[in-house]
């Protein structure tokens, strides 16, 4: 924290690969009002804060731009040391119960802010807000107060964020293992040869990746358009396995103390 402003850094919520694609590589698109990711905890300095900006980076689809749809970020806090109950399964509409009393507010990300973006990743920047009643405004005045003594270290409290899509999105990658001899499991650094979509348009260093059948791979340490270097390969892979990241969405929130 520096001065009266601080941000979360880029948070990497988990969207399980099993909820992004069918294990035979068939696409498994998210529909309007589906859960993108369930509650992710982060810590903020103790006290009351105003949310001043929210940013999302979306992975594209098959190396191309992601569908430009509105998104919502739901913010919540713990009560009596209990985290907000799960919203449900990603890629399905909200089915969980008991989370309403934990809610702090809703941030609405307007897709029009993404128009003309030339980045290989889809970036959304917006300060449009929605209060708990759901009416949109542009004041940027969502104020949150976390639950006291709920953080992981002294002087910090815990807040939770979850994501909801307001339109169809698809995180299948079409990045395919291109090794006729397949790939064995290894505990050492290895480089995977890939084809299909350019790996550099889908992934970035630091991403944790898996195959479409949930075969665990590892963390990306280097990339080219046709190769992915990882710190290890936890499970054996087969030629033409589709590779996905466990965090296709990244979120950054900034606050005024």
Question: Where does each model-flagged region fall?
Answer:
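Extended extracellular/luminal ectodomain segments enriched in beta-structured repeat modules
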Residues: 44-53, 66-68, 156
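Extended, low-complexity, turn-rich repeat/linker tracts enriched in Gly/Pro/Ser/Thr and Asp/Glu
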Residues: 58-68, 167-172
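Short coil-to-beta strand junction motifs in C2/discoidin
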Residues: 65-72, 247
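Autoprocessing Asn-cyclization modules and mimics
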Residues: 171-246
